[in-house]
């Protein structure tokens, strides 16, 4: 009998990855495809949902072929995804009425300020655990319903989009819903993705009528909410479809919650930080939805079938890896790997600070009008100083969140599990440890986002029996301990606060 595995579709901000894992959590197949980033106006970011679905089929097919696997060898499929990114589509045709509005998109900032001025921020925070921000799906959905021109997509029927939504003809969802719909024909999301819409009550665990009314989103549009690991399955792939097999789709988590699951942060106080386009620091708070007084989000960490929801505190940092991409865009570096060499060639930034607020600042500042700032330059400043300042900004932003996390939870983080593409950079990991004054632990399998959704799906179908098996799979690649004097780290961090102040409230209303 052929060996069996679990597959994971990891749909991210810049591309789509398909990975297959064996029982020990090791990677046996891996394929990736980038998709286009669409910038119609300053501060606007879109993706083409059709391109994402086509790429998904491509990477799944190619990943299996290159590894010499048959689809029938997959016991389950899990899905993980860039969160908050929002799609509205025609239920009958399955075609989107507009491009997806990406989590980074800031076009609804004015609407958010309207809500803030109306004094509704506290109500939203109490129900959803979220700051009222353009980051989340609620204002994105509202914008699409008010502004989409579906005929431009050459894919969906014309007619007033809002009227059609009110008539029950349109569906909305985050990327997981879009993929699950295309994989199984069912309109489903999981609790972690629902918790990022700003429409879902994380304490009552249901779509909130008051919020649906506030953002004028008809209840008929929203997906059914299910556990992250669901032994009743979300559905099966079509035997006559692109895979040619009926495979249970049984696990889904937003990418950051999936990384937490893949890092086996199953216990209260466990924390991880994922370094991607942005950085996302999550701490498991158990069955208690801890309210934040320090600009963090209260969110759902995960839910297993038949078990209570596990909550988390989250610090969402909008720009970390994207700051490295910026250095490439302006030709300061040729590729990301070059950053360590350039940054380590100087002892310090020589007083230069980079605040990479290209799309505003997330936790704990929440300023949609903050903008990227480079301060402290002199005629002696060289590109090496700017590159180092950019890497240091990742550490400072992480410390902003770590200090807020400790204040809210009362738990001191002595060890932080890290993952994501950037953690392959030893210099960056050491820098993080120095600035945070905390041990940084890098696991052997660093694609923990894909691993987390595979674990969720595999648990649902019995491929793994307990989370203890998953804990046994987790292995340390390297641990980084601080080599910097704490007084020096604190002095540098205090100066970072000054730099952040200069970036705030910069963008003017149009």
From Swiss-Prot:
Its EC number is 2.7.1.30. ATP binds at residues 13-14, 277, 321, 421. SUPFAM superfamilies: Actin-like ATPase domain. The keyword Nucleotide-binding applies. It catalyses: glycerol + ATP = sn-glycerol 3-phosphate + ADP + H(+). PROSITE patterns: FGGY_KINASES_2. GO terms for molecular function: ATP binding; glycerol kinase activity. Key enzyme in the regulation of glycerol uptake and metabolism. Catalyzes the phosphorylation of glycerol to yield sn-glycerol 3-phosphate. This is Glycerol kinase. It comes from Haloquadratum walsbyi (strain DSM 16790 / HBSQ001). The gene is glpK.
């Amino acid at each position: 009998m052929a060996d069996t595995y679990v597959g994971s579709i990891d749909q991210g901000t810049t591309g789509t990855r398909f990975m297959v894992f064996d029982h020990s959590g090791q990677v046996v197949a891996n394929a990736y495809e980038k998709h286009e980033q669409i910038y119609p106006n300053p501060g606007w970011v879109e993706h083409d949902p059709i391109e994402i679905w086509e790429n998904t089929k491509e990477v799944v097919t190619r990943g299996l072929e290159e590894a010499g696997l048959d689809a029938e060898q997959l016991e389950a499929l899990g899905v993980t995804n860039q969160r908050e990114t929002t799609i509205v589509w025609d239920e009958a045709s399955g075609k989107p009425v507009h491009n997806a509005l990406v989590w980074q998109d800031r076009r609804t900032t004015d609407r958010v300020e309207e809500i803030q001025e109306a004094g509704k921020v506290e109500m939203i925070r109490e129900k959803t655990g979220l700051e009222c921000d353009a980051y989340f799906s609620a204002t994105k959905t509202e914008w699409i319903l008010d502004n989409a021109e579906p005929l431009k997509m050459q894919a969906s029927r014309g007619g007033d989009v809002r009227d059609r939504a009110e008539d029950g003809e349109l569906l909305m969802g985050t990327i997981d819903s879009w993929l699950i719909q295309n994989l199984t024909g069912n309109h489903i999301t999981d609790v972690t993705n629902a918790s990022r819409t700003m429409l879902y009550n994380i304490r009552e665990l249901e779509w909130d009528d008051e919020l649906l009314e506030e953002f004028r989103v008809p209840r008929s549009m929203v997906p059914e909410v299910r556990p992250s690991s669901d032994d009743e399955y979300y559905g099966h792939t079509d035997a006559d479809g692109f895979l040619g097999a009926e495979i249970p789709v049984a696990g889904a988590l937003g990418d950051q919650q999936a990384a937490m699951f893949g890092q086996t942060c199953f216990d209260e106080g466990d924390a991880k930080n994922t370094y991607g386009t942005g950085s996302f620091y999550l701490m498991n708070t158990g069955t208690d939805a801890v309210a934040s007084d320090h600009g963090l989000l209260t969110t759902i960490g995960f839910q297993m079938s038949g078990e209570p929801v596990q909550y988390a505190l989250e610090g969402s940092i909008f720009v970390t890896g994207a700051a490295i991409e910026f250095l490439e865009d302006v030709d300061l570096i040729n590729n990301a790997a070059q950053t360590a060499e350039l940054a380590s060639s100087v002892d310090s930034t020589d007083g230069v600070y980079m605040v990479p607020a290209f799309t505003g600042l997330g936790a704990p500042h929440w300023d949609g009008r903050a903008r990227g700032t480079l301060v402290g330059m002199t005629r002696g400043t060289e590109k090496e100083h700017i590159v180092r300042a950019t890497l240091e900004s990742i550490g400072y932003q992480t410390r902003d969140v770590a200090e807020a996390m400790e204040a809210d939870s009362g738990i001191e983080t002595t060890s932080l599990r890290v993952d994501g593409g950037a953690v392959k950079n030893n210099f960056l990991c050491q820098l993080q440890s120095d600035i945070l004054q905390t041990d940084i632990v890098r696991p052997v399998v660093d694609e923990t986002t894909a691993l987390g959704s595979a674990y969720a799906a595999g648990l649902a179908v019995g491929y793994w029996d307990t989370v203890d098996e998953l804990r046994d799979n987790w292995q340390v690649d390297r641990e980084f301990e601080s080599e910097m004097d704490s007084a020096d780290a604190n002095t540098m961090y205090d100066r970072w606060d000054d730099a952040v102040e200069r970036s705030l409230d910069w963008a003017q209303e149009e």
